[in-house]
């Protein structure tokens, strides 16, 4: 195939990469750079995005097709996280300054941000930061720094809190290990200080959580209902539990 015949559109280019993977089983960054006549940085972003969506596995210098045995198309929990993340992304406007806390549900939000322009994103998660770097719209990335906590796989501590307090944000997107209907969001992690500061410096606090966690009381209270503005969950939320949350003055979105 000639370079001039290759698609410049991101969607078309990634489709062509997948076609090549189907035919060859693997591709190299060098091969794709020559084929599309674009930068290595752009190709690496393409491969990262395709890996994030479960289509391939990156390796040194290229990528291979995702082995069928590790593809789980019926992962209902993953689907729930995706629809919750999509609903959360719809609340984000161009040029917003947002915080994305660590966690698998909040991490799913990053994939939805590619069409947003001029975003500033603060995170305490290396995995979230890595996914942000793969976005073509290249949002401004800020990191809290601090002490690495192996349990939550995120930065915590006083340094991280001080960094956060030097900024202000439009929105915080945060997950939860459980939702106590009487008190608020709960977590296994005893280190809740950073979550408190994240909420303090954000004008809107959005909790993203799957419905099976609602009613589940973890040992540590993370955010009270008074600190939460919006809760986004899936349609598995019962009407009784929804009314209990609404009674705290929290907006509830079921998707």
How would you label these PLM feature ranges?
Residues 99, 121, 187:
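Conserved SAM-binding loop
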Residues 2-30, 34-36, 40-99, 103-104, ...:
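HTH-adjacent hinge/linker in prokaryotic transcriptional regulators
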Residues 2-21, 26-32, 37, 52, ...:
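Conserved phosphate- and dinucleotide-binding cores of soluble alpha/beta proteins
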Residues 67-68, 109, 163, 181:
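Residues at secondary-structure transition points
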């Amino acid at each position: 195939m000639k370079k001039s015949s290759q698609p410049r559109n991101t969607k078309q280019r990634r489709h062509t990469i997948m076609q090549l993977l189907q035919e060859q089983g693997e591709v190299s960054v060098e091969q794709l750079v020559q084929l599309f006549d674009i930068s290595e940085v752009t190709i690496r972003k393409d491969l990262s995005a395709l890996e994030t969506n479960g289509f391939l596995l990156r390796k040194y210098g290229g990528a291979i097709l995702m082995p069928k045995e590790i593809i789980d198309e019926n992962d209902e929990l993953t689907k729930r996280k995706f629809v919750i993340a999509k609903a959360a992304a719809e609340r984000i406007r161009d040029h917003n300054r947002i915080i994305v806390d660590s966690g698998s549900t909040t991490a799913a939000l990053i994939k939805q941000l590619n069409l947003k322009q001029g975003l500033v994103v603060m995170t305490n998660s290396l995995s979230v930061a890595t996914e942000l770097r793969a976005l073509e719209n290249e949002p401004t990335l800020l990191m809290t720094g601090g002490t690495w906590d192996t349990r939550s796989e995120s930065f915590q501590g006083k340094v991280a809190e001080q960094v956060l307090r030097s900024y202000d944000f439009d929105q915080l997107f945060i997950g939860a290990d459980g939702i106590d209907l009487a008190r608020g969001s709960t977590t296994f992690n005893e280190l809740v200080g950073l979550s408190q500061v994240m909420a303090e410096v954000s004008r809107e606090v959005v909790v993203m959580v799957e419905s099976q966690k609602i009613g589940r009381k973890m040992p540590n209270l993370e955010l009270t209902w008074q600190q939460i503005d919006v809760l986004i969950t899936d349609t598995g939320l019962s009407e009784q539990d929804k009314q209990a949350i609404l009674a705290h003055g929290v907006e509830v979105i079921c998707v």
